C-alpha cells in the first residue's frame, strides 16, 4: 500500500491499524530548536479520543502519545520525530460476523478487490482511528505556526444532520462534546443524538475550521495551490465527501459584484474567497467547511454480498460513532495545520528574500467569524478611480 505520506517539506508518514498493537507516524522536516513535550501533543489527542461522551463510540482508548525520537532536552533537533500511540481497548470479536461480508458504504469491498486481503477488525487501515496520529503530528505544526507567525487554527461543528448550529463564541467550543460554538443549542443536539442512537442509525455533519493570522503569500499558483492542497488534505479524512473554501458552492448563485472581495487601504471588505486567491493566501482568515457522511457501520440490516458474491444481510454490531462528525473537528484542524506548515516552510525556502514595497492590506476591516462582514465604523472613505481598460489576454 502506497500513499501513506503527506506533505513535501513537512512530511508525515503514518502507520498502523485500528486493532493492531499500535498506531504511529514519523514527522520529517520539523525545524530544530522548538520546545516540545508529550503534553503539547496530548492536549489535542484528548479532544479527539473516543469514549468521551455517550454520543460517540464507547471504545476506551487513552491515546497516550510517546515521543520516540527527534526531541533532545525538551527541544526538537531537526531530525525525524517518531510518535507512537498504543491500542489498548480492541474488541476484535465484534467483527467476526462481517469477516466474509462487506459493509455497505464502507471500504471493505474495495480493499478486498484491490489487495486480495483485508483486516476486517474495525476496518483495519481504513478506520478513522488512523486520524489520531494526524492530530498528534499536527499538534507540532500548530505550535510552530503559532510561535513563528501567530497563526491560530480552530474549528467547530456547524451542522449536525439537519440541525444548523449558529456560531456564537469560540469559548463555547471546548465546553461541550459537539464542539458547538452555540452553548444554547447543546441540549437539542443531545436529544437528537439520543433518539438517533436508540434507532440504530447514523447521521452526517458539517465542520468549519478557520485559520487566523496566515500571512499573505503562502501557496503556489498552479498545481500546488493552497486551496487545492487544503481540499486534498481534507478529502483524505475518513468519511469526508465534500469541501468548501470561503463561499464555496454558494458562489454559484452570487454575482461578481457580490462575490469579489473588494479591497480598501484599511483592509478587505469581505471574504468570499476564504482567504485564498489564485492559490495563494491573502492574509485574511482561511475558512474551510467539510461535509462528513453518516457512519456506514450501523445496527440496522442492510443488503450486501459476501466474498463469493452471494446476497447477504449485514448488521454491524460493536462500538461505533453514530456520527463520526462529532469527533472530526480536531481532525479537520489537524489537516489544515499540516497543509499550512508545509507551505510555510516552502514559502520560506523559496521567497525569504522577496521584498515588496506595497503595504500589506489588513485581512479584516470588520468583525470575524459569526459576525457580519464589512467595513468597521472607523473605515476611511475611499474614492476609487474609474477602472482602466482591461489588458488583452
Curated annotation (Swiss-Prot):
Cofactor(s) essential for the protein: FMNH2
EC numbers for this chain: 4.2.3.5
Cellular component annotations (GO), alphabetically ordered: cytosol
Pathway assigned to this chain's UniProt record: Metabolic intermediate biosynthesis; chorismate biosynthesis; chorismate from D-erythrose 4-phosphate and phosphoenolpyruvate: step 7/7
Lineage of the species this protein comes from: Bacteria, Pseudomonadati, Pseudomonadota, Betaproteobacteria, Nitrosomonadales
Subunit field text: Homotetramer.
MF-aspect GO terms: chorismate synthase activity; FMN binding
Gene giving rise to this polypeptide: aroC
Full protein name: Chorismate synthase
